[in-house]
Amino acid sequence: MKFFIDTANVEEIKKVAKWGVLDGVTTNPTLIAREGRDLKEVIEEICSIVDGPISAEVISLESEKMVEEAKELIKIHKNIVIKVPMCEEGLKAVSELTKLGIKTNVTLIFSAQQALLAAKAGATYVSPFLGRIDDIGSFGIQLVEDIVTIFTNFGIESEIICASIRTPIHVLECARVGGDIATVPYKVFAQMLKHPLTDRGIEQFLEDYKSMNK
């Protein structure tokens, strides 16, 4: 499984990049707005930190304008992937961008049907949102499992980015059912590091070492 980090905070990206586990980054307009910085400036800095796919989202909701935005975004760096919302205009844009050889990530996927349409249109990645589905009393992981099964059945090459990750259990479940990628917030990465028995074991090692050197 590959790990992306879901943030536009460069300090968070730098921290996790040093662990040697990052394969890419996903951003969106909301995350970039929180940083209070110019979009291009933020994306350029992220690309200098992580050598992997960097998803940057278009703002327009008309396919022609999405394509125009995408052409500008890919000028920033060769690793840019164009993030497009799941909608009719989005699919039109994905189809056109695929013909131009531009990689795409279709976001806001909430059903396997949507994922199938996005893949058929040529999406490089599809992003089902686990946490938001859990929020309405359903099972986000079932969606990921359904998409994995369908893509496997038909040899579909679009990769599945498990998004809206809220807990380490979400990451574990995605890995269990075969999600290709988990895009994980910094907070959840930090939680994945921790286990009380690990902490206790380290404390015990230190106590034993000190007692040996008295």
Swiss-Prot record:
<dbReference type="InterPro" id="IPR033919">
    <property type="entry name" value="TSA/FSA_arc/bac"/>
</dbReference>
<dbReference type="InterPro" id="IPR022999">
    <property type="entry name" value="Transaldolase_3B"/>
</dbReference>
<comment type="similarity">
    <text>Belongs to the transaldolase family. Type 3B subfamily.</text>
</comment>
<dbReference type="GO" id="GO:0005737">
    <property type="term" value="C:cytoplasm"/>
</dbReference>
<dbReference type="GO" id="GO:0005975">
    <property type="term" value="P:carbohydrate metabolic process"/>
</dbReference>
<dbReference type="GO" id="GO:0004801">
    <property type="term" value="F:transaldolase activity"/>
</dbReference>
<keyword id="KW-0704">Schiff base</keyword>
<dbReference type="InterPro" id="IPR001585">
    <property type="entry name" value="TAL/FSA"/>
</dbReference>
<dbReference type="GO" id="GO:0016832">
    <property type="term" value="F:aldehyde-lyase activity"/>
</dbReference>
<keyword id="KW-0570">Pentose shunt</keyword>
<dbReference type="InterPro" id="IPR018225">
    <property type="entry name" value="Transaldolase_AS"/>
</dbReference>
<dbReference type="InterPro" id="IPR013785">
    <property type="entry name" value="Aldolase_TIM"/>
</dbReference>
<dbReference type="InterPro" id="IPR004731">
    <property type="entry name" value="Transaldolase_3B/F6P_aldolase"/>
</dbReference>
<comment type="function">
    <text>Transaldolase is important for the balance of metabolites in the pentose-phosphate pathway.</text>
</comment>
<comment type="pathway">
    <text>Carbohydrate degradation; pentose phosphate pathway; D-glyceraldehyde 3-phosphate and beta-D-fructose 6-phosphate from D-ribose 5-phosphate and D-xylulose 5-phosphate (non-oxidative stage): step 2/3.</text>
</comment>
<dbReference type="GO" id="GO:0006098">
    <property type="term" value="P:pentose-phosphate shunt"/>
</dbReference>
<keyword id="KW-0963">Cytoplasm</keyword>
<protein>
    <recommendedName>
        <fullName>Probable transaldolase</fullName>
        <ecNumber>2.2.1.2</ecNumber>
    </recommendedName>
</protein>
<feature type="active site" description="Schiff-base intermediate with substrate">
    <location>
        <position position="83"/>
    </location>
</feature>
<keyword id="KW-0808">Transferase</keyword>
<dbReference type="Pfam" id="PF00923">
    <property type="entry name" value="TAL_FSA"/>
</dbReference>
